[in-house]
């Protein structure tokens, strides 16, 4: 609940600060008594103002401490965002290198696949050729002679068994390439899934940090609004204190004028200082009490009936 300083002073001192018309039963209150009453009221107002100043100072210090804490949190959050952005950039560089490496591996796998297809085609041809040769060998030994002639015409193979060994080597190479390709594909799929998961986590963290920034900014704006309200109230307190000080000065001036007038009319010789308002009020009160006593005696004298004259007998 916000503290309304104006309503507080209005409720606490409305009856004291407003100038009231005296009631009929206060017709006989002396001006000195009224001045003393006003002075007591001014002391109460000054005490209340002093209390409010202390409360305001304490709340101002609390708000300043809260503002410092919010600014420190904001600096820490900015530093975290800077480090996190650096982390993202580093991981983005790693991701690009991984993608480049995966692309190179895919190209190599594609090249190896083409080589495998080529070797497979060659292998198929060799198998067909072997089968034909076996059939022909079974049917006629002419094929053996044919192979011998082929071996004689080429420098690549020296014996028929070398051709068979070459075929087995090509088959083993093909199987090895197929296994490597399958492994590379599985690795690429795993890296892709890991990258997608990392991107989702990164987006969630960025969203959470943005929400925290928005919340801290809202708290900072509210703290600034509260500080502005208290600054306005402090200005109002200072204005009220200035008005009360001016009013007190007027009361002291009126007291001094009344004291000087009474001293002059009654020809009193006193050594009371012009700054000693309390002593002046006491002197004024004594004079008014004396005048009231004289007035009362005069009233009594007027009310005593006069004794009629006794006639003398001649």
UniProtKB/Swiss-Prot annotation:
<dbReference type="GO" id="GO:0005856">
    <property type="term" value="C:cytoskeleton"/>
</dbReference>
<keyword id="KW-0175">Coiled coil</keyword>
<dbReference type="InterPro" id="IPR025252">
    <property type="entry name" value="DUF4200"/>
</dbReference>
<dbReference type="InterPro" id="IPR051147">
    <property type="entry name" value="CFAP_domain-containing"/>
</dbReference>
<dbReference type="Pfam" id="PF13863">
    <property type="entry name" value="DUF4200"/>
</dbReference>
<protein>
    <recommendedName>
        <fullName>Coiled-coil domain-containing protein 42 like-2</fullName>
    </recommendedName>
</protein>
<feature type="coiled-coil region">
    <location>
        <begin position="175"/>
        <end position="233"/>
    </location>
</feature>
<feature type="coiled-coil region">
    <location>
        <begin position="34"/>
        <end position="139"/>
    </location>
</feature>
<comment type="similarity">
    <text>Belongs to the CFAP73 family.</text>
</comment>
């Amino acid at each position: 609940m916000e503290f309304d300083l104006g309503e507080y002073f209005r409720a606490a001192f409305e009856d004291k600060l407003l100038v009231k018309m005296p009631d009929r039963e206060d017709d006989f209150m002396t001006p000195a008594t009224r001045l003393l009453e006003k002075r007591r009221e001014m002391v109460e107002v000054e005490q209340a103002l002093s209390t409010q100043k202390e409360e305001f100072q304490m709340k101002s210090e609390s708000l300043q401490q809260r503002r410092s804490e919010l600014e420190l949190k904001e600096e820490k959050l900015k530093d975290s965002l800077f480090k996190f952005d650096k982390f993202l950039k580093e991981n983005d560089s790693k991701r690009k290198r991984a993608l480049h490496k995966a692309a190179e591996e895919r190209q190599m796998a594609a090249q190896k696949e083409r080589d495998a297809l080529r070797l497979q085609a060659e292998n198929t041809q060799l198998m067909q050729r072997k089968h034909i040769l076996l059939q022909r060998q079974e049917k006629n030994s002419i094929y053996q002679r044919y192979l011998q002639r082929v071996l004689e015409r080429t420098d690549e193979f020296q014996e028929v068994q070398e051709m068979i060994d070459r075929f087995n080597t090509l088959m083993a190479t093909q199987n090895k390439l197929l296994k490597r390709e399958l492994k590379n594909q599985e690795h690429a799929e795993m890296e892709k899934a890991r990258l997608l998961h990392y991107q989702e986590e990164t987006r969630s963290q960025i969203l959470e940090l943005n929400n925290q920034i928005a919340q801290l900014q809202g708290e900072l704006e509210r703290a600034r609004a509260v500080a502005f309200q208290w600054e306005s109230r402090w200005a109002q307190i200072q204005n009220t204190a200035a008005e009360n000080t001016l009013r007190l000065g007027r009361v002291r001036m009126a007291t001094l004028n009344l004291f000087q007038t009474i001293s002059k009319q009654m020809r009193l010789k006193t050594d009371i200082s012009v700054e000693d308002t309390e002593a002046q009020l006491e002197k004024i009160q004594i004079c008014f009490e004396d005048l009231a006593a004289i007035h009362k005696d005069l009233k009594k004298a007027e009310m005593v009936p006069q004794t009629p004259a006794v006639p003398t007998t001649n």
